Amino acid sequence: IFGIWAGLVGTSLSLMIRTELGKPGSLLNDDQLYNVVVTAHGFIMIFFMVMPIMIGGFGNWLVPLMLGAPDMAFPRMNNMSFWLLPPSLTLLLASSAVESGAGTGWTVYPPLSSNLSHAGPSVDLAIFSLHLAGISSILGAINFITTIMNMRWEGLLMERMSLFVWSVFITAILLLLSLPVLAGAITMLLTDRNFNTTFFDPSGGGDPILYQH
């Protein structure tokens, strides 16, 4: 139900984006609002529709079935990772409602390093929302990798697994490799905005200055 609701919200945001792109200025007539819609649409469709429905629901049912396993390796972890998503969505909605919203188009952190253009708690709420959604995804990925590595019935070697199981396995590994990079970047952004660090160029533009001495 949560995934279906998120899908409907994401679809309505898609329609708004398509309408605005078809005839600019006809619907929203505000660049910042349009960017907020694009950003929210991306997050909602990925973290709150695709992850709970296609991976959390469908994958959790089909992968053990294809492995001959009675269940996932950590059934309770699925539950825990799902219940991180509603508060994450709440934070994302709160970020869009506070001030002018975190509108950055498809990317998240580069344009946000400047406190001048995005002052206030809106971006910080979006960052915390991403942290929760990322933790949820990482828990799910660990569960899938552990299940596929350890829960196959005897005789089902890795090369005999179905392509669907392989695709979930590789996707989970790539997720574990990529999400900490995003987490590090948005955490650096969070400290830049609130603790006076300078991981990103303080004059704006989003250029990292980590290795410049």
UniProtKB/Swiss-Prot annotation:
Gene3D superfamilies: Cytochrome c oxidase-like, subunit I domain (1.20.210.10). Residues 64-81, 146-162 are mitochondrial matrix. Pathway: Energy metabolism; oxidative phosphorylation. It is an enzyme of class 7 (translocase). It is found in: Mitochondrion inner membrane. Its EC number is 7.1.1.9. Ca(2+) binds at residues 20, 25. Fe(II)-heme a binds at residue 41. It is a multi-pass membrane protein. One of its GO terms (cellular component) is mitochondrial inner membrane. Binds 2 heme A groups non-covalently per subunit. Binds a copper B center. It comes from the Eukaryota. Its cofactor is heme; Cu cation. It catalyses: 4 Fe(II)-[cytochrome c] + O2 + 8 H(+)(in) = 4 Fe(III)-[cytochrome c] + 2 H2O + 4 H(+)(out). SUPFAM superfamilies: Cytochrome c oxidase subunit I-like (SSF81442). Disulfide bonds: none annotated. Keywords: Calcium, Copper, Electron transport, Heme, Iron, Membrane, Metal-binding, Mitochondrion, Mitochondrion inner membrane, Respiratory chain, Translocase, Transmembrane, Transmembrane helix, Transport. GO terms for biological process: electron transport coupled proton transport; mitochondrial electron transport, cytochrome c to oxygen. GO terms for molecular function: cytochrome-c oxidase activity; heme binding; metal ion binding. Residues 22-42, 103-124, 184-213 are mitochondrial intermembrane. The chain crosses the membrane at residues 1-21, 43-63, 82-102, 125-145, 163-183. InterPro entries: Cyt_c_oxase-like_su1_dom, Cyt_c_oxase-like_su1_sf, Cyt_C_Oxase_1. Component of the cytochrome c oxidase (complex IV, CIV), a multisubunit enzyme composed of a catalytic core of 3 subunits and several supernumerary subunits. The complex exists as a monomer or a dimer and forms supercomplexes (SCs) in the inner mitochondrial membrane with ubiquinol-cytochrome c oxidoreductase (cytochrome b-c1 complex, complex III, CIII). Component of the cytochrome c oxidase, the last enzyme in the mitochondrial electron transport chain which drives oxidative phosphorylation. The respiratory chain contains 3 multisubunit complexes succinate dehydrogenase (complex II, CII), ubiquinol-cytochrome c oxidoreductase (cytochrome b-c1 complex, complex III, CIII) and cytochrome c oxidase (complex IV, CIV), that cooperate to transfer electrons derived from NADH and succinate to molecular oxygen, creating an electrochemical gradient over the inner membrane that drives transmembrane transport and the ATP synthase. Belongs to the heme-copper respiratory oxidase family. This is Cytochrome c oxidase subunit 1. It comes from Loligo forbesii. The gene is COI.
